[in-house]
């Protein structure tokens, strides 16, 4: 029975894979707005899906790249326009101070390194760039190449991973289903935790 449900869901994903570039693009735009969505999980899923449906590889890649890149720009302008109001927490300020130190030491190289760091550090890097003295044009140009580099690397690795699964595992559908469920579950859990923290703060 479980296998039947898994196959039904995977078949539904396969039959609607043409919409995946739009879905991935939209999710990454939301991530740029600080919605707790994992860019790494999306790139992983996109690469694996592309390895199974080669005809959609370019579209999926473009959806992920432009979503990630525009999401970065959104984060930059959030920092530029609203950063001082948003980051009143001491821990947030300490993180931003560290990032600003690296910007001072290494300049735009910080963007290239930061693009490979997961767990919400990316957005902090982009926002601190907006809050600092980095010019918009410099960020937009530098981040274009930083995003291109990181997405190409992660997407290629995910694509190769998907191909390896096809060779090693005959039941690749179950693995993709598990990743799909894990992404959804992680997003929901992070959202609930953040919401509970806000409720606790209001009660205090």
Curated annotation (Swiss-Prot):
Superkingdom to which the source organism belongs: Bacteria
Family of this protein: Belongs to the DedA family.
Keyword entries, A-Z: Cell inner membrane, Cell membrane, Membrane, Transmembrane, Transmembrane helix
Protein name: Inner membrane protein BB_0250
Function: Required for proper cell division and envelope integrity.
Residues annotated as transmembrane: 17-37, 58-78, 101-121, 139-159, 172-192
UniProt subcellular location: Cell inner membrane
GO cellular component: plasma membrane
Protein species of origin: Borreliella burgdorferi (strain ATCC 35210 / DSM 4680 / CIP 102532 / B31) (Borrelia burgdorferi)
Major location category of this protein: membrane
PANTHER family assigned to the protein according to its UniProt record, in alphabetical order: INNER MEMBRANE PROTEIN DEDA-RELATED (PTHR30353), INNER MEMBRANE PROTEIN YABI (PTHR30353:SF15)
Membrane topology of the entry: Multi-pass membrane protein
Note: Can restore normal growth and cell division to a E.coli double mutant lacking both yghB and yqjA.
Phenotype upon gene inactivation: Depletion results in abnormal membrane phospholipid composition, defects in cell division and cell death.
């Amino acid at each position: 029975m479980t296998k039947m449900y898994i196959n039904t869901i995977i078949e539904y994903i396969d039959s609607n894979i043409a919409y995946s570039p739009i879905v991935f693009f939209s999710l990454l735009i939301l991530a740029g707005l600080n919605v707790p969505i994992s860019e790494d999980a999306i790139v992983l899923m996109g690469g694996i899906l592309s390895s199974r449906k080669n005809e959609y590889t370019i579209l999926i890649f473009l959806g992920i790249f432009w979503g990630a890149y525009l999401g970065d720009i959104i984060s930059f302008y959030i920092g530029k326009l609203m950063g001082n109001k948003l980051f009143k927490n001491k821990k947030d300020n300490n993180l931003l101070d560290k990032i600003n130190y690296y910007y001072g030491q290494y300049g735009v190289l910080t963007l290239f390194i930061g693009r490979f760091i997961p767990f919400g550090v990316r957005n902090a890097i982009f926002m601190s760039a907006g809050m600092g003295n980095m010019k918009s044009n410099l960020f937009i140009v530098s981040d274009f190449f930083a995003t291109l580099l990181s997405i190409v690397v992660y997407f290629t690795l995910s694509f190769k991973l998907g191909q390896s699964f096809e060779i090693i595992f005959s039941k690749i559908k179950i693995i993709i289903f598990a990743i799909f469920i894990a992404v959804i579950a992680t997003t929901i859990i992070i959202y609930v935790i953040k919401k509970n923290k806000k409720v606790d703060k209001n009660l205090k």
